[in-house]
Structure formats: C-alpha cells, structure tokens
Amino acid sequence: MEAGCPHHAFGTGILGRSIVPDQNRIMKGTLVVDGTSTEATTGAVADVVVTSVPFWLDLDGLDEESARFLAETLQLHRLAVEDAEHFGQRPKIDEFDDFTYFVVHGAIPESFATSELHIFLLPHGVITVHHGDCPALADVHARIARRHLIEDVSPQVSLLYLIVDSLIDTFFPVLSRFDDRIDELEDDILRQPTEAQLGVLFDLKRSLIAMRKVITPQRDMFAALASGVVELPSMTAEGQRYFRDIYDHLIRIADIVDGYRDLLSGVMDTHVSTVSNRLNVVMKQLTIIATIFLPLSYLTGFFGQNFTFLIGHVTGRLPFLAFGLGLELATVLVLVYFFRRRGWIGGPTT
C-alpha cells in the first residue's frame, strides 16, 4: 500500500491506468453510487475508480486541488480539465482516448439567461461540473434516488441522457415566459407606447440571441450523437433512440426561438408605428392651434392693437417689465401644463 494513504490500494482504474490516490480531501460536490448520495472525497472517488463501480461525481466548480485530482489521479486530459475550470465555453463534444467531454447549456428558470454544465463521460461513470445550484441536476438526483434509470442502456449512458434531457427541458418553461412577456408588451404598446418598453424589447431580443447561440450548436452536436457520427462508449442503437429524442427537443426549441425573434421584430415595428401615429396626432393638433392664431397674430400686428387698460394702470418701467414677463411666463407654464396633461411631453396621455 502507498505510504500516507492507508485507505487506498493501487489498482487499474476507470481509465485503464494505475490509480494513485492522493490524500483523502473533501471535494465541493456529491458522489452518487448505487443510488446513494454522499459527500464527495478524493478517497471515495479513488475507491470507486479502482473497483470500476458505476458512479456519478457532481461537482460545484473546480478549485485548483480538485482540478489536479481529476488530471493527475483520474488521469483526465489536462485540456479537458482546463476547459471545465473556465466557464463561458460554447457547446461541444470532445472525444479523447478514455472518455468523452461535453459542454451543454440549459436555461435558468428565474431569468432569461443560460446555464453551463461540463460533463465527463467515462467508461464506468459520469463527472459533472457546474457553478452554483443547478435545478436540472437536482431533478436527476431525485430520480436516481428513486432508482428511475433507463434499464435497456448502460448506467453511464442512462445517466448522461437523464442529465442532458433534464437540462434541455429547462428551456421550455423559460420560453413559455418569453411568450407571456411578449404578449404583455404588445398589449401595453398598443395601449400606450413608452421608451421603457423599447428597452425591454431590446433586452428580450438580446436574450433570444444568446439562447440561439447555444441552441444551434447543441442541435448539431446531438444530431451527430443520435446518428452515430459521434460514437460513445457503451452506446447502443437503443441509446441512440433516446438521444434522438433530445435532438427533437432541440429542433423544437430552435424553431420556437426563431419564431419569438420574428415576433419581437414585429412588436418593435408596432412600437415604432404606434409612436409615429401618436406623433402625427400631436402635430395635427398643434398645427390646428397654430393655424387659428396665425391670422389673429397677423391682424393684431398689422393694425398695432394694444390694451388701453395698461395706460394709466401700469406705470414705470419695472412694473411694466414685470407685468410683461410675468404674463409671458404664465403663458408658457399654462402651455407646458396643457402639453403634459395631453401626454405630448414628459409622459403618457390621459
């Protein structure tokens, strides 16, 4: 036995190489073996690797020591481990000699953003890496605890399907919220368009574009997986049927996203048209007012009309100046109040 590691023996591990476990250190995650979840430690992981027992190691982020454990003890390729350390990766499948590395994206139910999951598919197990809580994985943990696995495929392929399927399904409730939000905005715009609505529309459009960027490569990725272009260890024809189901879901999601993007463009056009029509109405009313006062101003200016009441009642330069400026200021304030009440400046119409 290795000095300093009394709990572990050398052996041929999950990658077909000699496993030399390091110190029994607690990892930030959960180890699932035979439906039972326990706190993940390097010693426990090394044990299941040596015995080739099907397992699932679910990690909440990779610190430097955990990354070193995956690379040196489990002997995963350093390029894949480095990718798993840094989030912001595009969806992809990388095939290595002893394992397959996935980057899969889902949706965050509380917002219109996307989440990212890194998956290592090994001959006898699965390792997942994510940041923070992942509700999709919580559902998978619950299913495994109830022993709801797919019986006609290998345990690791079954687990991979459950994880990816649960992650992809998170898009549907988020897209349903998109639909409701777009309908609300369209009703609000037809009732009263505002600048704030335009900002919300652009935010939604950016979210859809971000979602489209992860959906399209994932659709192509699982198309290759379902058709057998990419071959996974222990993958059977029955397993490919399950991944074709994921591919079908991704096609539906991509079509929905494209439809919502077109719908948002139509709502933006509606906003612009509504604002333009409203501006035309305002200009029409102002033109009528100006047309009424134009001949009156011409006549009073042509004949030099003045108010005789001012003669003898307002004397001196300062009182006359104060009266004139005060009357002008009062006129401006009345007009501003009238325009605001009509919603022509500074707010909605009444």
Task: Briefly describe each language-model feature range.
Residues 4-235, 241, 245, 249-259, ...:
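Peripheral, non-transmembrane regulatory/ligand-interaction domains of membrane transport proteins
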Residues 56-57, 236, 286, 325:
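A generic secondary-structure micro-motif detector
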Residues 75, 248-350:
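Hydrophobic alpha-helical transmembrane segments and their immediately adjacent juxtamembrane loops
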